[in-house]
């Protein structure tokens, strides 16, 4: 499938999606937990930032390749979206123009799309926040775009430095964005839920006053690294 990266003039109408209940569960677990649960893979660039705060979600990726400074394929992609999807967009060459604003967001909301992940710029951000339409973007930029050059819809793209296939699960929150392969959805969900349970146990122990030094059995390793304790700074003199 990677040989399809960068191809243009193609729209794939039918893609496979994971079960919505599993997607929603990944969204509740959050980016950090999911990223750790899949051995720290799939995390998009830290430059992909939310324009809003307090939103955590997941959805099936509808992928879009656009030309620099050209948002034509956004409009093409809207037709291919279903409720629960997340639109994932990448330019064929780096560009931070404002590809997306409130009108396209209105169209996507009408299709039940949950969010936009775009490796480029967006604008109308205050209106987008007022609408409750979630966006993670590389830039905020009022510079507009044209509608002239073909791209693709539902072919693999590289977004935020990660390969994203149509139908992969995208999890996004205040910490960033992580991608989960569609065929790894269930196994990742099991691992992430287990990790969340263990973290809750540790949280309760920490709240009760236990030290991370003891919970994580750090003392012997610290000693082996050469860490030593002295009662007073004067003990180091002479």
Curated annotation (Swiss-Prot):
SUPFAM superfamilies assigned to the protein according to its UniProt record, in alphabetical order: RraA-like (SSF89562)
Source taxon at top rank: Bacteria
Swiss-Prot/TrEMBL cofactor(s): Mg(2+)
Catalysed reactions, as listed in the record: 4-hydroxy-4-methyl-2-oxoglutarate = 2 pyruvate; 2-hydroxy-4-oxobutane-1,2,4-tricarboxylate = oxaloacetate + pyruvate; oxaloacetate + H(+) = pyruvate + CO2
Binding positions for Mg(2+) per the UniProt entry: 124
GO molecular function: 4-hydroxy-4-methyl-2-oxoglutarate aldolase activity; metal ion binding; oxaloacetate decarboxylase activity
Enzyme class: lyase
Entry annotated with the keyword Membrane: no
InterPro entries: LigK_PcmE, RraA/RraA-like, RraA/RraA-like_sf
CDD domains on file: RraA_family
Signal peptide: none
Pfam families: RraA-like (PF03737)
EC number: 4.1.3.17, 4.1.1.112
Sequence positions that bind substrate: 101-104, 123
Alphabetized UniProt keyword annotations: Lyase, Magnesium, Metal-binding
Function: Catalyzes the last step of the bacterial protocatechuate 4,5-cleavage pathway. The preferred substrates of the enzyme are 2-keto-4-hydroxy acids with a 4-carboxylate substitution. Catalyzes the conversion of 4-hydroxy-4-methyl-2-oxoglutarate (HMG) to pyruvate. Also catalyzes the conversion of 4-carboxy-4-hydroxy-2-oxoadipic acid (CHA) to pyruvate and oxaloacetate.
Subunit structure: Homohexamer.
Family: Belongs to the LigK/PcmE family.
The protein, known as: 4-hydroxy-4-methyl-2-oxoglutarate aldolase/4-carboxy-4-hydroxy-2-oxoadipate aldolase
């Amino acid at each position: 499938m990677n040989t399809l990266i960068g191809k243009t003039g193609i729209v794939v109408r039918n893609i496979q999606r994971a079960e919505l209940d599993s997607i929603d569960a990944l969204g509740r677990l959050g980016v950090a937990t999911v990223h750790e649960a899949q051995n720290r893979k799939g995390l998009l660039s830290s430059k992909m930032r939310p324009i809003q705060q307090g939103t955590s979600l997941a959805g099936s990726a509808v992928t879009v390749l656009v030309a620099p400074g050209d948002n034509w394929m956004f409009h093409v992609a809207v037709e291919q979206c279903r409720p629960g999807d997340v639109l994932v967009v990448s330019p064929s060459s780096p560009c931070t123009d404002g590809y997306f604003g409130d009108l396209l967001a209105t169209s996507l909301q009408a299709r039940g799309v949950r969010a936009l992940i775009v490796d480029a710029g967006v604008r109308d951000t205050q209106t987008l926040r007022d609408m409750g339409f979630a966006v993670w973007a590389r830039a905020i930029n009022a510079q507009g775009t044209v509608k002239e050059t073909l791209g693709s819809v539902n072919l693999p793209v590289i977004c935020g430095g990660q390969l994203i296939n149509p139908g992969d699960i995208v999890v996004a929150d205040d910490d960033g964005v992580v991608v989960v392969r569609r065929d790894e959805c269930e196994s990742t969900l099991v691992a992430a839920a287990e990790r969340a349970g263990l973290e809750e146990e540790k949280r309760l122990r920490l709240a009760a006053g236990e030290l991370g030094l003891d919970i994580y059995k750090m003392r012997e390793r610290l000693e082996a690294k050469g860490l030593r304790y002295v009662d007073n700074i004067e003990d180091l003199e002479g």
